[in-house]
Amino acid sequence: MKVSKWIGVGAFLTFCVVSVIFLTSLGQDLFKIENASKKASTTYQYHFVLVPEELDNEYWQLVQKGAADAAAAHHVYLEYLGPKQADIDDHLKTIDMAIAGHVDGIMTQGLDAKKYKPLFQKAREKGIDVVTVDTDAEGSKRQVYVGTDNYYSGFIAGQALIADTKGEQYVGIVTGRLDAVHQKQRVKGFRDAVAAEKRIHIAGIEESAITKSGASGAAYKLLNDHAKLTAFYGTSALDGAGIIQATAQYQSSTDIYVLAFDTLPDTIQALDDGEIDAVVVQHPYEMGYQAVESLVRLQKGEKEEPLQYTGTSVIRREDLPLQQTDRRQGVQP
């Protein structure tokens, strides 16, 4: 009985400590936003917050770079806040804190329209403008979407595979997150593009959790599970680098075709080295820049087009080298 009592007390104290740490962290983040709002109100014209899928992701850092450059040009105080690792609950909490901090505008991914709709409604009721970036939240209260047409990007990826290969193809798909809207759209577009090609078969699909190590593990599993695998399609920024890490370790006589996403330095180097065959190009820098400009216009009461696609294309080794400005912006040379 005494042991059970002490276990119960220990569990209660642990719960209290964890709760205090969480609330302290939450309070610190909210304090930062509120302090930033005070600073913005005295030295800047507007205060915007960009909430990425995860802070340290290279792709989102390009979005942030574009947003920061536009913010500097338009006298905007910009904050870059969000989860260290992809977590939809932390993502939602950050948006809620931004609303509580009375910012002027929010830029964020629309990962799940049902979950985001109440928050976007709350923001709009408080006079805060909302722009989704990279991934839309259709049917929510967001005013503008700036980013890739994700279905189309998947479709042209499928067209690239058709154009670049001959004979029977067994494709393994590595996707960032199975439940993410934009990843689903990229997979669907790809499937639709190759559907009429009887020689092309989808062997399987695995999740990378938008990490290089996750992509490597997913690719290795697909290689082990499907002996006939001849091609890979990676739908998120770090998938390409992870896929080639797995194929390099896997003993196979087959020359595996690799189709990747986004012009991160490692991906472009792999394309140049012949380890990756084609890359779907997005424009993350432009997304960030255009999103800030859209918020500025909304703040001025101007009407905005609700869908602002930033374009997508496919590049191959012969399209290299990319110019430095093109690499930063993720655009085709």
Predicted segments, located by residue:
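Hinge/cleft segment of the Venus flytrap/periplasmic-binding protein
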Residues: 10, 23-30, 34, 286, ...
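Extracytoplasmic "Venus flytrap"
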Residues: 46-65, 70, 74, 79-93, ...
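An alpha-beta-alpha
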Residues: 48, 157-197, 204-205, 295, ...
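Short, solvent-exposed amphipathic alpha-helices that sit
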Residues: 59-74, 153-157, 181-200, 214, ...
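Short beta-strand elements in bilobed, periplasmic/extracellular small-molecule ligand-binding domains
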Residues: 71-85, 170-175, 194-213
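Hydrophobic alpha-helical
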Residues: 108-124, 190, 208-268
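Flexible loop/hinge segments that line or gate small-molecule binding clefts
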Residues: 115-152, 264-270
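Hydrophobic alpha-helical segments within soluble ligand-binding/sensing domains
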Residues: 146-170, 214-216, 267, 283-300
